[in-house]
Amino acid sequence: MKFLGNVLFLAACVAAAQSPQANQPVAASPVPVEMAQLAVTVKQQFGDTFSIPAKFTTPVITADFDGDGVEDVAIVANSKDPLPDSYAFKYEVADPYHAYFGFGDPRLTSSFRADPEHTHHLLVIFGSGKEAWRSVTPKGKFVLVNVPFDSVEVGRMLLSKKKPPIFVIKALEAQVMDSAIWWDVKKKRWRWEPGDTVQ
């Protein structure tokens, strides 16, 4: 009987050790983003002028783009004029692509439509608190204009040998090149860099 009691006690200890404790962090499992909810989020955070294009199979990517340990999001969206609602919805419009070439004032460049195939914008929400990018009051909101891409995905880039790699938005152009869009923590601005030419 004593042997059976010891076995049960040992089994209980093993089960307790395998179950997550209240004070231990549990890795978050990826939750798929529903398109209907995503459209509601875009409307609430950026206004009615933005819509999610139907042809994009992956219009949303998530990662910690600003390095604060909270999940952020980048959403592909369309808008004929992203500037007017920036005041009411408190988002910043940036043009990291043209800034790379020395001309990145979005008040002027947001009207550039040189390539009709690349007219989409990237909406970026920096997450805040437990709800991360789904928070009603996120840490920051941005509309990135004029970045040429056919699709986007999460990438990583090493800026310094002394620091771990950062998460970036990889902008992929099927017939031209890949590029990286990343948040410069020191200068508090978005940057664009060309990558490898697609063969």
Language model features with spans:
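Beta-propeller-forming repeat regions
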Residues: 18-199
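Bacterial N-terminal signal peptides
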Residues: 5-15
